[in-house]
């Protein structure tokens, strides 16, 4: 299930970024005594008492009319929209302000769980933070984010208010599919075409975020779930900055999926945001299919597809294992191939290699191309085994893990792929130190 989202909001310069850094344990957000330094949202996974959640740091909510302030306000309101729970930070030293009251009214309208955080309380008995009861948001939790005082109690309260961890409602063999990409590349058309073709939607099960909907269906005896289709299928109902919102939704969907369909607009090419989103799927070990949509709009000759393929491989060189489909969601050209390829890469991601066969392959690979020496030390691989699937994960027992060069690990990966395929799925290696005999 997806991690709950916790948004830190409040007016400028109350210590939101300091609290964010205190919780995640790293100085990621800019901390400066000047309103507006955190103009964009920052996202970081965090954990407390065994509960994982995604923390969002926002720019300060201000209700002035200048352009930058309006942009910050949109970002913060967007974080509120996404969040499962909100940490509303106020400055106990300055006391209650008119902006605090306006933010409080905004949060009450959002109808989300809110924890009121009275920050900058270094001495609990000397700072009167009780005025904040007027906000009607319950008891303020006094903390000093800068000093770390009482932040443990705050996190205890946060964990108590996180959404319950629901059991997985789907059959164990269900393939979860995330359709990701920038706005207006045709994600909604592809989703609607897939669901419209099947006409056997079983259920719409709410996810953790407010409007996340999973659309499940069955085809040829196989169970599928299109993860979080609400943001795509009902976009007209969402009056929010779509470009920024789409990245967050994509990352959350990737966390939950087995197969990521990365959709591009054939008329626009590949943007940095595309690389960021699909790179996240790669890092998370998800099976990936590249979908080049709107292929019907491209003027073609017999070399057009080859030119596109070459460009894609240059721009996304780290995804050389990933299949590409050229489709038109509008005309349904090659759309039936999408689920066929989903089945294929999902099977590849779950494939296992017998230990004896794997060790024979590694032995032949090292004999053909021995590991390079490093300062008179040579890497020796004693034993190999597959430790997991989704993604396929291989454990190599070696004499000196630190001298394994990336290029040689890549060589071993290519040898494994040459023999066993693993098309569409990343491969992971873990090295363990061990004394012993060569395989």
UniProtKB/Swiss-Prot annotation:
Q: Where is the signal peptide?
A: none
Boundaries of each EngA-type G domain copy?
Answer: 4-166, 175-350
Keywords in UniProt for this one?
Answer: GTP-binding, Nucleotide-binding, Repeat, Ribosome biogenesis
Q: Which residues form the KH-like domain?
A: 351-435
Q: Give GO MF terms, alphabetically.
A: GTP binding; ribosome binding
Domain of life (superkingdom):
Bacteria
Positions bound to GTP 1: 10-17, 57-61, 119-122
The UniProt record gives the binding positions of GTP 2 as: 181-188, 228-232, 293-296
Task: Please provide the Gene Ontology terms (biological process) for this protein.
Answer: ribosome biogenesis
Give the record's family classification: Belongs to the TRAFAC class TrmE-Era-EngA-EngB-Septin-like GTPase superfamily. EngA (Der) GTPase family.
* Oligomeric and partner information: Associates with the 50S ribosomal subunit.
Its biological purpose is as follows: GTPase that plays an essential role in the late steps of ribosome biogenesis.
HAMAP family, per the entry: GTPase_Der (MF_00195)
Q: Tell me the protein's name.
A: GTPase Der
Write down the species: Desulforamulus reducens (strain ATCC BAA-1160 / DSM 100696 / MI-1)
